[in-house]
Structures are given as structure tokens and as C-alpha cells.
Amino acid sequence: MAFLKKCLFLVLFLGLVSLSICEEEKREEENEEVQEDDDQSEEKRGFLDVIKHVGKAAGKAALNAVTEMVNQGEQ
């Protein structure tokens, strides 16, 4: 009977150890996924900032061109 208890405790202990190792690996994988998502978000934000600045510059150039045309038409 004592032998069976020892075997049962050993099996339970090894099961708990492997479960904790699996959970740790799962957390590490989730952290890596979160970091990858953060990197992709930063890239998207950078791209959108560039588009925003280009749009502003194009708008200002168009406004200046229209203003010059109006000024020339008034003269």
C-alpha cells in the first residue's frame, strides 16, 4: 500500500510540474504575440502619420494655388 501511495504522489507531482511548465510556455507565447501586435501597431501609426503629413502638405499647396489664381483674377 505504501508503494502505491509513493507512486501516486510521484505521478501527481510530475503532472503538476509538467502542467506548470506548459502554462509558463503558454504565457511566454502570449507575451511574444502581444509584442508582435505592438510592433505592428507602431508601424501602422507611423505610416498613418506620414500619410497625414503628406495630406496636410498637399492641402496647403492646393490652397496656395487657388489663392494665387483668385488674386490673379482680381488684378
Curated annotation (Swiss-Prot):
It is found in: Secreted. Pfam families: DD_K, FSAP_sig_propep. Has antimicrobial activity. Expressed by the skin glands. GO terms for cellular component: extracellular region. Residues 23-43, 74-75 form a propeptide. The keyword Glycosyltransferase does not apply. Belongs to the frog skin active peptide (FSAP) family. Cruzioseptin subfamily. Residues 25-44 are annotated as: Disordered. This is Cruzioseptin-8. The modification Glutamine amide is found at residue 72. GO terms for biological process: defense response. InterPro entries: Dermaseptin_dom, Frog_antimicrobial_propeptide, FSAP. Keywords: Amidation, Amphibian defense peptide, Antimicrobial, Cleavage on pair of basic residues, Secreted, Signal. Residues 1-22 form the signal peptide. Its main location: secreted. Residues 30-41 have a biased composition (Acidic residues). The keyword Iron does not apply.
